């Protein structure tokens, strides 16, 4: 029996013009977009559609924008009936909306706060991230341990696919790794355009504030399992899910293990909902045999709704 997982991308997938094709052209999507505009304390639609002020790349804006786009696409799709859901980092919040753990309005407030806390935690230039290509996890982990000291750390942060491990930590060490990467055996080490050491233990500084903020919202049991970044398995209990979303701030994204867990459960079709095909590309490198569908635009939505 074929099983399906709906999956959602995280930061880095955003682009100017996102969701503009959906607005006023699909009632369900427009409802989500309008709701985001009413709920948030900044002009999210202008930021997503035209971004004249150049704010889309700031994490406190990127996070609600991506959640809103994925949720608008999701609302527009018919006959999905997924067995599981999974998101990459920020994308996990779209999974929580899809599985009815959080209402969209609550989720968009939470990711706005998450972005603000992340942005405030570190002055520009303190923390950063980089993608290490061509080395396995154990080797990257070993390099990180050898570079880290008592007052500066670098750690694996996103275990994306074989040969692609993202590291996170103090910018000085990230810069050192970028410089020394090839001599340490990597094909390349690419710095990422992020403003903080996300998914590293440095993010524990915002744990308390974030935890107390999300406690004010209603968390419900998931309608179908959410495969969580921190433990790479499906969860439905709202307390477990909520606790894992706090840990997610400072824990690595276990994307390889999460994908393999889903395949072990019989999933052979992954539907990526949101801008870009980043996750589909990663999954292809984990398992070439599964079916991949990408839903990014109004045209994709129409194609799905007409055929399924």
Curated annotation (Swiss-Prot):
The active site is at residues 89, 199. It catalyses: holo-[ACP] + malonyl-CoA = malonyl-[ACP] + CoA. One of its GO terms (cellular component) is cytosol. GO terms for molecular function: [acyl-carrier-protein] S-malonyltransferase activity. It comes from the Bacteria. InterPro entries: Ac_transferase_dom_sf, Acyl_transferase_dom, Acyl_Trfase/lysoPLipase, Mal-CoA-ACP_Trans/PKS_FabD, Malonyl_CoA-ACP_transAc, Malonyl_CoA-ACP_transAc_FabD, Malonyl_transacylase_ACP-bd. GO terms for biological process: fatty acid biosynthetic process. It is an enzyme of class 2 (transferase). SMART domains: PKS_AT. Pathway: Lipid metabolism; fatty acid biosynthesis. Keywords: Acyltransferase, Fatty acid biosynthesis, Fatty acid metabolism, Lipid biosynthesis, Lipid metabolism, Transferase. This is Malonyl CoA-acyl carrier protein transacylase. It comes from Staphylococcus aureus (strain MSSA476).
């Amino acid at each position: 029996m074929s099983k399906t997982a709906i999956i959602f991308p995280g930061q880095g997938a955003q682009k100017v013009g996102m969701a503009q094709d959906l607005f006023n052209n699909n009632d369900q999507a427009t409802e989500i977009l309008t709701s985001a505009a009413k709920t948030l304390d900044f002009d999210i639609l202008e930021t997503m559609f035209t971004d004249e002020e150049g704010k889309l790349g700031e994490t406190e804006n990127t996070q609600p924008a991506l959640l809103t786009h994925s949720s608008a696409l999701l609302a527009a799709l018919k006959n999905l009936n997924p067995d599981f859901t999974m998101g990459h980092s920020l994308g996990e919040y779209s999974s929580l909306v899809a599985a009815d753990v959080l209402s969209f309005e609550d989720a968009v407030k939470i990711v706005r706060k998450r972005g603000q806390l992340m942005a405030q935690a570190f002055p520009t230039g303190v923390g950063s991230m980089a993608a290490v290509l061509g080395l396995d996890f154990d080797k990257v982990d070993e390099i990180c341990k050898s570079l880290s000291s008592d007052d500066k750390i670098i750690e694996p942060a996103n275990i994306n696919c074989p040969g692609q491990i993202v590291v996170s930590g103090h910018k000085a060490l990230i810069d050192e790794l970028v410089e020394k990467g090839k001599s340490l055996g990597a094909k390349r080490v690419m710095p990422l355009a992020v403003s903080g050491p996300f998914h590293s233990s440095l993010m524990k500084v915002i744990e308390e504030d974030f935890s107390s903020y999300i406690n004010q919202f209603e968390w419900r049991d998931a309608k179908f399992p959410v495969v969580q970044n921190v433990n790479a398995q499906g969860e439905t209990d709202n307390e477990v899910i909520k606790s894992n979303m706090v840990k997610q701030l400072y824990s690595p994204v276990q994307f390889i293990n999460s994908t393999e867990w889903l395949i072990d459960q019989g999933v052979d079709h992954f539907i990526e909902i949101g801008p870009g095909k980043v996750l589909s590309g990663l999954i292809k490198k984990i398992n070439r045999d599964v079916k991949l569908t990408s839903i990014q635009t109004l045209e994709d939505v129409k194609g799905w709704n007409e055929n399924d």
